[in-house]
Amino acid sequence: RDTLKNAQKGRILSAPELLDVLHLIRGIRGILQYDRSISVPHDNLQDLISTLSVSTEAEKKIAACINEYGEVTDNASPALRQIRMQKRQAEADISAAVNRFLADHAASVVDSIVTYRQDRAVILVKSSEKNSIQGLVYGDSASGQASYVEPASLIGPNNRKQELLSKEKEEIDRILALCSAAVGSTAEQDISNLETCALLDSLFAKAQWGKERNGIAASLT
């Protein structure tokens, strides 16, 4: 309910919140499909079920952008797909630059595993060697025997990745805003759907309880 109210107020929902809304919409669709498939008379419930409505536009938008894990997919927009392709290339460039540095400075390197400082790939080298390596120093290890260095050959690829990460965030925010707007446009109906589902769930739970105990409905005369 809070998620729907936030969308109604124009706030941008997170990808996991949008996935929750998608589950609600699909749940409503499932109830309506089940209602059409059963032949047993259920007039007492029909008035309730008839108030349910599927938010088709929001369902389509969310399903096209958010995967089952609550993540924005590459195919959410052509721009995002392109940015992520470029980001993967930047990561490959970083990996290649690291491998070249490790091969050329094997005697200076303490650990061949890439570490990240301030979201930038750096390499752990002997502190005694840090001033002989062209690049940026991000501090020393706890022991003081090694230093985190961003070699000059990594600065360009790291900058490129940071630029792409910023663009990726902007595009994701744009996509989330569009999906949230679609949810907001039908939020009032979906809040009503949620309340109806809660009532139906309560009624079915009571019916199941009575069935398990061979109960019968009282008749007032």
Question: Predicted regions span which residues?
Answer:
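Conserved amphipathic alpha-helical "coupling/scaffold" segments
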Residues: 1-79, 83, 186-189, 193-207, ...
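Coiled-coil heptad-register positions
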Residues: 36, 98, 102-105, 172, ...
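Extended, Lys/Arg-enriched charged tracts that mediate electrostatic binding to polyanionic substrates
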Residues: 81-130, 200
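Intracellular alpha-helical coupling/juxtamembrane segments of multi-pass membrane proteins
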Residues: 83, 87-90, 168-175, 179-200
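Glycine/charge-rich, flexible interdomain linkers and switch-proximal surface loops
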Residues: 105-120, 183, 187, 194, ...
